[in-house]
Amino acid sequence: MSFVPGQENAGSRSSSGNRAGNGILKKTTWADQTERGQNNGNRGRRNQPKQTATTQPNTGSVVPHYSWFSGITQFQKGKEFQFAGGQGVPIANGIPPSEQKGYWYRHNRRSFKTPDGQQKQLLPRWYFYYLGTGPHAGASFGDSIEGVFWVANSQADTNTSADIVERDPSSHEAIPTRFAPGTVLPQGFYVEGSGRSAPASRSGSRSQSRGPNNRARSSSNQRQPASTVKPDMAEEIAALVLAKLGKDAGQPKQVTKQSAKEVRQKILNKPRQKRTPNKQCPVQQCFGKRGPNQNFGGPEMLKLGTSDPQFPILAELAPTPGAFFFGSKLELVKKNSGGVDEPTKDVYELQYSGAVRFDSTLPGFETIMKVLNENLNAYQNQAGGADVVSPKPQRKRGTKQTAQKEELDSISVAKPKSAVQRNVSRELTPEDRSLLAQILDDGVVPDGLDDSNV
């Protein structure tokens, strides 16, 4: 019994036009229509015989035979089509492992002319054929053939042909190519999808079945390729990839002083209860200094605000708007308006008090308690009372010189002695005594006179 890919029972096939045995309209793939596209406008003429591998023109515009599966298209030049051993056979319902053997056939596609007049060759597309079918039906498994890559399941017997029927595109559509888990697709290739032309296929078939009066209308609904590949698809894919990489892999946006100022001003323009402090607009700029009435926040959290890594777990304790209004004690208080020169306006405060209750079963309880203990009344542990974040100390001019002067003044330096003091130890000579006697009124110089009494 011959096997039919995609069907459990091979005997259920039908050849009734474009409908399968179950009466469902079947669509065809791009490979099917490429071969028949040349005869679309030749109604009433005798159909041309199907071209085979030996009669295929070098232009590559015709796909010989009909593969059971959608193709694999190359989109990067210089890549080699290959599968690892035991891989590469498309899977389909109804095909036992013993029949999973065959080859991938390279179809050289047509060339096209670019807007500047140059000829450009489309990269090839590969189609799978079971062993004993397709353009190389008479070849043995493993024969060295240009443009053929052999694949087989580890349980398949490659010495015999696969018992698989040829595909009739009028009865069976091409199956989307799928591989067994773990199969590595060749680099630089992608699997052609199928089914994208199903609406056009059905509308085209319906319009053709309405009679000759609708043939002109049906010409605009001709079935389109199931997988339309633009000539420059490889370039487009590369451009998209580069654009994506350029977006994601670019340098991080730098925050300048100007941008930080704009962010801060944008936050401060909001009502007080709508502000969200962050690095650009710290807590004290949003809500003021810490003190008895605003007693939460340590130095690190006051700098980072909600950007602090510990803040998200605290946010789990924050009440919802519903809990705020319905679970708190609210009081509306009218406040005095501005100064005398300011326009008169009514100012109110919605004062509230409440509590958030939690216990040790709360996820992250220990971390929450640690963060709360570090930030509650943290201003009391800082020098300067309510000023938790101490301002940057200003450098006073002349401080260094003043300190040096004070240091010099604190050092006691002995003053040099006079000439008389330096001679205290010298004995008086008789000449000195005579001279002193003349000076003194009484003319007597005591014997005990020394330089210390002079």
UniProtKB/Swiss-Prot annotation:
Q: Classify the main location.
A: virion
Q: Where is the composition biased (Polar residues)?
A: 49-61, 215-227
Q: Where in the cell is it found?
A: Virion; Host endoplasmic reticulum-Golgi intermediate compartment; Host Golgi apparatus
Tell me which residues make up the CoV N CTD domain: 260-383
Q: Which superkingdom, per the lineage?
A: Viruses
Where Phosphothreonine occurs, residue numbers? Answer: 177, 429
Its PTM note reads:
ADP-ribosylated. The ADP-ribosylation is retained in the virion during infection.
Which residue intervals make up region (Disordered)? 1-62, 186-230, 271-290, 383-428
Record's protein name: Nucleoprotein
Question: Where in this protein does the record put region Dimerization?
Answer: 267-384
Instruction: List the InterPro entries hit by this protein, alphabetically.
Output: N_prot_C_CoV, N_prot_N_CoV, NCAP_bCoV, Nucleocap_CoV, Nucleocapsid_C, Nucleocapsid_N
Phosphoserine carried by residues: 170, 194, 390, 425
Q: Which UniProt keywords apply?
A: ADP-ribosylation, Host Golgi apparatus, Phosphoprotein, Ribonucleoprotein, RNA-binding, Transcription, Transcription regulation, Viral nucleoprotein, Virion
Q: Which PROSITE patterns match?
A: COV_N_CTD, COV_N_NTD
